[in-house]
Amino acid sequence: MSFEAWIIATGVLVGVSCGLIGTFLVLRSMAMLADAISHTVLLGIVGAFLVTGSLDGIYMFIGAAATGLLTAFLVQLLHSKGVQSDAAIGVVFTSLFAIGVILLSVYGANVHLDIEHSLMGEIAFVPWNTVTVFGVDIGPKAFWMLASVLVLNVVLISVCYKEFKIASFDPQMALALGIPVLLIHYVQMGMLSLTTVASFDSVGAVLVVAMLIVPPAAAHLLTDRLLYMLILSALIGGLSAVMGYFFATWLNVSISGAMAAMTGVCYASAFLFSPANGVITKKLRTLNMQKERAG
């Protein structure tokens, strides 16, 4: 595959992976927790490096997953003690992220690990960091990492679809049915953490938030059924990555930024033209009804 194809494929994997797990966050009104975890995993990455002295992917995954779960646990703990959800997210988010930034500034100055790279990413460099198996170059490391995370997300969603669905729409009913709502919550937070850290090398922590929130939000405007919402969210995320790449090459701007911008374009289109909820669609429907009454 060409460098261009690897970049597009990696971006599509980011969009699809984030779109799937982001759907449940949007349904549970936890979109800002995605923003928090996407930043606090920096502490897990730095911590993994300080403990192991290695930038190997598996250690990053473990550190990020642990920090993501810690973030979710602390937010849940503060909320259970009477702190408002948004305030709890703000306290945990800023505290853990600040600790990560300080540790990175103090101990990570001499390694290929910096704040700007962690936050912004650079998908154009993805094809240069490849994986070799039995002497054969099989492609970019980021691509295969994201592919593995996507497979894991799809498997977990498929196996736990009923539990995820009930817990997202009616947690009290889920508890009454014996579904471990808290366990489901932490499974989803683990999925979010892994998806976020896998996306660091491509779109970065800041821009991955757009992929986690905007495609599911757009899909929610287009359908009320969870299965269709998952499919549409994944499609919008993947389509945004493709459009963003060509838009970026056309204007010679940041590829990651263009991909995130395209999610906004997709959301605006759904907001205006959604068959059931679109602003313009509703206006046209109202005008047609007025004409029918007048006629």
Swiss-Prot record:
**Biological process according to GO:** monoatomic ion transport; response to zinc ion; transmembrane transport
Q: Which GO terms describe its cellular component?
A: ATP-binding cassette (ABC) transporter complex; plasma membrane
The places in or outside the cell where this protein is found are: Cell membrane
Gene3D superfamilies for the chain = ABC transporter involved in vitamin B12 uptake, BtuC (1.10.3470.10)
Q: Which residues cross the membrane?
A: 7-27, 42-62, 63-83, 87-107, 138-158, 174-194, 203-223, 227-247, 253-273
User: What membrane topology does the annotation report for this chain?
Assistant: Multi-pass membrane protein
Q: Which UniProt keywords apply?
A: Cell membrane, Ion transport, Membrane, Transmembrane, Transmembrane helix, Transport
Induction note:
Repressed by MntR in the presence of manganese.
Per the similarity annotation, which family is this?
A: Belongs to the ABC-3 integral membrane protein family.
**What is the recorded function of this protein according to its Swiss-Prot or TrEMBL entry?**
Probably part of the ABC transporter complex MntABCD involved in manganese import. Probably responsible for the translocation of the substrate across the membrane.
**Subunit details for this protein?**
The complex is probably composed of two ATP-binding proteins (MntB), two transmembrane proteins (MntC and MntD) and a solute-binding protein (MntA).
What the entry lists under PANTHER family is as follows: ABC-TRANSPORTER METAL-BINDING PROTEIN, METAL TRANSPORT SYSTEM MEMBRANE PROTEIN CT_070-RELATED
Q: This chain belongs to which protein, by name?
A: Manganese transport system membrane protein MntD
